[in-house]
Design a protein with these regions (language model features):
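Cysteine-nucleophile active-site neighborhood
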Residues: 104-173
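N-terminal beta-loop-helix "entrance" segment that forms/cooperates
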Residues: 73-86
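Short glycine/proline-rich turn/loop motifs
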Residues: 85, 105-108, 267-268
Length: 326
């Protein structure tokens, strides 16, 4: 998927070196189709690495995607501050827009109570805004915990030890639109200190668990209309991301275990095997395909379509069914 991102963005040069289409802005303006409009709320301190990983995944289908980069204004960044000023807009700058998609990343704050995070109130306003102005939002890792808690009252619990490694996940419904093409068992990287309350998830009729693992628990969760998608792991991670996290903590003298099912022979000097790449690409391709098939041509109609999908889903759930088109 050709992506339309600002000229000069560091990720653009990296992606072009990988033979991924990143359109020049003047070329994108001349294409006679409406690009999907996606916003990326990047809460990670590693801004450039995270945006590159996500842009790499949303570039894998033949529809142009225009990406706006969003930041919170209630948190003072200590990493890549100049990069944020140059390429990122605040929520207040973007809130008058409608979007086909929104991606909310994780953040290294999962051991804190939600309300203790300094930008929590602003994040809640963004999630509330997205309920009307975004066709589909994908929440990643801590972003998923935040969305499940704020929008569905799903609590998190802290784990006795960090869930760290690559873990097998089993599909709960092989015919689900979002996991179309997935193997019945597939791998997903995880790097987190918390887990969601599974009983609360299973008790919420608006939510469906798409995949889960014996060790990791629920990995992919979505609302019935795919307005919200929650990925508890890190499909966006590159081959070496877990290794980088391991060596970072190791050299800092922090307690850290080897990531499970990752290094060959559990030898951190060996190159990890990239076992989740195809399913990561499938997830984002399926998500963008859903958005493309569902979104109105006129972005001004996004709130109307979101309301129609929600009403349709609620009516079917009240009758004990699920939306047949999904």
């Amino acid at each position: 998927m050709p992506i339309n991102i600002p000229d000069g963005l560091p990720a653009k040069r990296i992606l072009q070196q990988e033979r991924i289409f990143a359109l020049e802005e003047d070329v994108a303006r001349k294409q006679q189709i409406r690009p999907l409009r996606v916003a990326l709320l990047n809460l990670m301190p590693t801004k450039i690495e995270t945006e590159t990983q996500i842009l790499r995944l949303i570039s894998k289908s033949p529809i142009q995607v225009s990406v706006d980069f969003m930041r919170v204004s209630s948190h003072e960044a200590t990493h890549a501050a100049d990069h944020l000023v140059k390429f990122y807009d605040t929520f207040d700058d973007l809130r008058s827009n409608n979007y086909d998609g929104l991606i909310i990343t994780g953040a290294p704050v999962e051991q804190m109570p939600f309300e203790s995070v300094d930008y929590w109130d602003e994040l809640c306003r963004i999630m509330d805004w997205a309920q009307e102005h975004v066709l589909s939002t994908m929440f990643l890792c801590w972003g998923a915990f935040a969305g499940l808690y704020h929008l569905h009252g799903i609590h998190k619990r802290l784990l006795g030890s960090k869930l760290f490694g690559v873990f097998p996940q089993r599909l709960c419904d092989e015919y689900n639109f979002l996991t179309n093409g997935f193997d019945e068992v597939h791998n997903m990287p995880h790097s987190r200190h918390a887990a969601p309350d599974e009983k609360e998830i299973d008790a919420d009729p608006a939510l469906q668990v798409l995949s889960r693992g014996e060790t990791s628990g629920p990995a992919l969760i979505a609302t019935r209309d795919f307005h919200e998608i929650y990925a508890l792991g890190h499909f966006e991670y590159g081959r070496d991301t877990l290794a980088d996290e391991y060596w970072r903590d190791f050299h800092a003298g922090l307690p850290i275990q080897l990531p499970l099912n990752y290094f060959p022979d559990d030898d951190p000097e060996k190159q990890p095997i990239f076992t989740w790449r195809s399913h990561a690409n499938l997830l984002y391709r399926n998500w963008l395909n859903y958005v493309y098939q569902t979104t109105p041509y006129d972005l001004e109609r996004v709130p109307e379509v979101v309301a129609e999908l929600r009403e349709h889903t609620e009516q079917l759930l009240a009758k004990g069914g699920v939306p047949s088109k999904f």
